[in-house]
A protein has these predicted regions:
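Terminal low-complexity/disordered tails
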Residues: 354-357, 361, 400-413, 417-428
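Entry beta-strands of beta-propeller and related beta-repeat scaffolds
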Residues: 110-116, 177-180, 229, 285, ...
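Conserved blade-ending motifs and adjacent loop-strand segments that build the rim/top face
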Residues: 384-409, 436-462
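Preference for solvent-exposed, low-hydrophobicity sequence contexts
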Residues: 145, 170-398, 439
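Beta-rich, blade/repeat-based domains predominating
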Residues: 157-164, 219-220, 336-343, 396-411, ...
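Short coil turn/linker residues within repeat-based beta-strand modules
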Residues: 94, 134, 371-373, 435-438
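C-terminal motif of bacterial Sec signal peptides marking the signal peptidase cleavage site
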Residues: 2-5
């Protein structure tokens, strides 16, 4: 909110007491989407206590005239970030103009707060956008269906699998709204889509050195970090590229050789269980590699001298005294099956991880550990980690029993939402991570396909059913 009072001298030198005007301009919000109604009912305060009757009004936004009445009702039609919404009030008796203003932003209707849903309809991949809107405190999203086809004029593809956003530079990047990597098995395969306009921006296969996928590769996910991008195949094989600049979403090419964990380059890293963590201060991401039966840190870090360590594969280092006699070792999980690993933010740099594991006797456990931020260095061969606990989860064997698909979602903000959501068929459960208890949360009419709560303080949970 900005309150100003000023006037222009029009050369009227009749000396008399001026009935100056102080103008206060307020709006219901500071952020709008194209097509939203912007309403403002300004408050005018007259210094002599009596309102002038002969006044003219002019509203402008970013320098463009949008209204000529005292109260504003304007359908936002101009995209602009943090621009002045100004009311000019002309006193026709004196020729003096007074001003009041505030600052608002208008974005694409598809770049505002909300959710993008990837689904399949009549054999085709589709994207829908759910713009966040509440009515009397109740969430009632505005839904735009099949937005990709609407914008691009052609179907997106077939057999959709996953969707991940690009890492976005806070100040100087291409698009603060980010772009979206959509992986699909049919059509063009994985494609890159603008998160603002929903126009197609790229095709994964054309970003390999050979301008085509490596033999046998079928993309099921593309995960983009600040410098490193990982293209993941349905067999878990990972192909990587290191971007030339973190200001660009796509620069340089993917290597045609897979990511490996050994010096000889023979043991491929499995990317089917990545603890996706959109926190660039961590210097990479952690995954569980079933090929070597251990957790690995995949580096994403460039130092101030310009040396880029992105793409290095580093085991975790935990001091042996931190483990109990029966705890699973993070660098040797051969006696356990790992069903899920997720990440949550703790402090600047350090990331907390939680895994669902099962021993050979069929008991399920919650495994908690913390991984330090990776800071590069040619002599660094392992990333420091701290083992926190391993607790049995009673009743989980009835949820993860192999009879139906299980979906998992660990809330990022564990201080506000200490939950891990798990689905089985039509039933949604939540595991209370602070209290080590499993609860039934909700029942749906059809099987659950995905769970998401990626919003401020995890205040909403979105459940997609088949």
């Amino acid at each position: 909110l900005a309150i100003t009072s000023c006037y222009e001298d029009k050369g009227n030198y009749d000396y008399r007491e001026m009935n100056d005007i102080e103008i206060s301009v307020e709006t219901e919000s500071s952020f709008y989407a194209l097509g939203d109604k912007v309403i403002s009912k300004p408050e005018l305060v007259f210094t002599l206590g009596k309102e002038n009757s002969d006044l003219s009004y002019e509203w402008t936004f970013d320098g463009h005239v949008i209204g000529d009445t005292k109260d504003l009702e304007w359908i936002a039609d101009t995209i602009a970030s943090t621009k002045e919404l100004r009311l000019a009030v002309l006193d026709n008796n004196t020729g003096v103009t007074y001003f009041g203003s505030t600052y608002i932003s208008v974005s694409s209707a598809y770049a505002s707060n909300g959710w993008v849903v990837l689904s399949e309809k009549e054999g085709n991949s589709t994207l829908s956008f759910l713009r966040e809107q509440t009515e009397e405190g109740i969430l009632k999203p505005v839904v735009t269906r099949d937005i990709y086809s609407m914008i691009n004029g052609v179907p997106m593809g077939t057999q959709p699998v996953s969707m991940y956003p690009h890492w976005t530079e806070r100040w100087d990047g291409e698009d603060k709204t980010s772009w979206l990597w959509v992986a699909q098995k049919g059509g063009q395969g994985a494609i890159d889509i603008s998160g603002s306009s929903y126009k197609q921006e790229g095709i994964l296969s054309q970003m390999f050195l050979s301008k085509s996928y490596p033999e046998g590769f079928v993309s099921v996910g593309v995960i983009d970090m600040q410098f490193l991008t990982m293209a993941i195949g349905e067999d878990g094989t990972i192909y990587t590229r290191v971007k030339d600049s973190n200001l660009l979403f796509n620069s340089s090419n993917f290597l045609d050789r897979p990511l490996t964990s050994d010096k000889e380059g023979k043991i491929k890293v499995d990317g089917s269980m990545i603890a996706y963590a959109p926190f660039d201060e961590h210097g990479g991401m952690v995954l569980y590699d079933k090929n070597s039966a251990q957790y690995l840190h995949i580096a994403d870090y460039k130092n101030w001298q310009g040396y880029n360590y992105s793409g290095k594969v580093l085991p975790l280092k935990v001091e042996e005294y931190e483990y109990g006699p029966s705890d699973a070792r993070l660098d040797n999980m051969k006696d356990y099956s790992v069903y899920f690993v997720g990440a949550s933010l703790v402090d600047w740099g350090d990331i907390s991880y939680m895994s669902i594991i099962k021993d050979k006797a069929g008991k399920f456990y919650m495994q908690k550990f913390k991984v330090e931020a990776y800071g590069g260095g040619s002599s660094v061969t392992k990333v420091g980690a701290s083992f926190i606990s391993q607790s049995e989860i009673k009743g989980l064997d009835a949820v993860i029993d192999g009879t139906s698909k299980n979906c998992f979602y660990l809330c990022r903000n564990q201080d506000k939402a200490p939950y891990l959501f798990i689905s089985k068929g039509e039933t949604l459960y939540f595991y209370y991570t602070d209290g080590n208890k499993l609860y039934t949360c909700a029942q749906f009419d059809s099987p659950i396909a995905s769970i998401d709560a990626e919003c401020f303080n995890n205040k909403y949970i979105i459940v997609d059913t088949i």
